[in-house]
């Protein structure tokens, strides 16, 4: 059987749904959040609802979810100024922040390799302020390289889908918003 299910959400409506999701058996949440700047958030999401997302995160934390991760897509000339704010939020609120290299999913035809902020660059930016300790996750199953903060206040994950693809050992199944199952983000069917 299935022992564990995680849900990825934009969290626009999470404030009102967090407790019900937890009560239904969901234990882990991944929330997509690329910016804490209201204007940048609106530009990326085409909606002016950053506060709704932040309220949803608070509601999920207060409901008692076992794990809440923030997924931030790392785009060159956009994300550099967002990284430390997301890190500080994660450290203070108990969220794991995961930075994902900008991948060529490209429904909007905007992907260019020059726009990828690579995982090693993200780690170097963070190391300007914090000491990071790599986590040996050779026994873990998942796409992220993980790091603890040396002071013990939280951890981050770096998903290097472009610079170090993980397709050979991917173990994920995804359900699209319209209910279709996909074994790969890059598949057409």
Regions found by a protein language model. Name each.
Residues 105-189:
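Accessory C-terminal segments flanking Radical SAM cores
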Residues 36-38, 104-107:
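A short, flexible beta-alpha/helix-coil linker loop
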Residues 1-98:
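Radical SAM/AdoMet-radical enzyme domain recognition
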């Amino acid at each position: 059987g299935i022992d564990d299910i995680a849900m990825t959400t934009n969290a626009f409506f999470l404030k009102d749904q967090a407790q019900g999701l937890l009560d239904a058996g969901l234990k882990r949440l991944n929330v997509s959040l690329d910016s804490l700047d209201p204007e940048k958030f609106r530009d990326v999401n085409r909606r002016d609802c950053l506060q709704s997302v932040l309220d949803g995160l608070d509601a999920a934390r207060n409901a008692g979810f076992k794990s809440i991760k923030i997924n931030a897509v790392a785009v060159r000339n956009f994300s550099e100024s967002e990284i430390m704010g997301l890190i500080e939020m994660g450290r203070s609120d108990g969220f794991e922040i995961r930075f994902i290299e900008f991948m060529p999913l490209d429904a909007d035809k905007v992907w260019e390799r020059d726009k990828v902020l690579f995982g090693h660059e993200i780690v170097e930016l963070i190391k300007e302020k914090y000491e990071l300790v790599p986590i040996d996750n050779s026994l873990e199953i998942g796409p992220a390289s993980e790091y603890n903060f040396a002071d013990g206040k939280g951890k981050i994950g770096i998903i290097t889908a472009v610079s170090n693809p993980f397709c050979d050992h991917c173990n994920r199944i995804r359900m699209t918003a319209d209910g279709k199952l996909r074994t790969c983000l890059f598949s057409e069917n």
